[in-house]
């Protein structure tokens, strides 16, 4: 299954990279590599995850991030990659705008 990452989700990932870069040398690169491993795995596992706020939600394997996606005719569309420590109300509002 084809996996497409929307621009908004790419910006979310860039924010995560910037956060981890501030934590220590190489941490941002590690985050980037691991989050894309999780996203790439959706080509095989899309649809098995619970839905939250109208989207499927995959929990990232190595960081406290949540990958929100939907299944579309062309495959999988990742709409957001958000810090799982955020308030659920804030996540809901953000996802309604996407």
Give each language-model segment a name.
Residues 18, 27-30, 50, 54, ...:
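Solvent-exposed interaction patches of small proteins and small membrane subunits
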Residues 66, 70-98:
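Enriched for short, Lys/Arg-rich terminal
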Residues 36-37, 41-76:
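Basic/aromatic recognition patch in beta-strand/loop cores that engages polyanionic ligands
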Residues 1-32:
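Arg/Lys-rich, positively charged N-terminal/basic patches that mediate binding to nucleic acids
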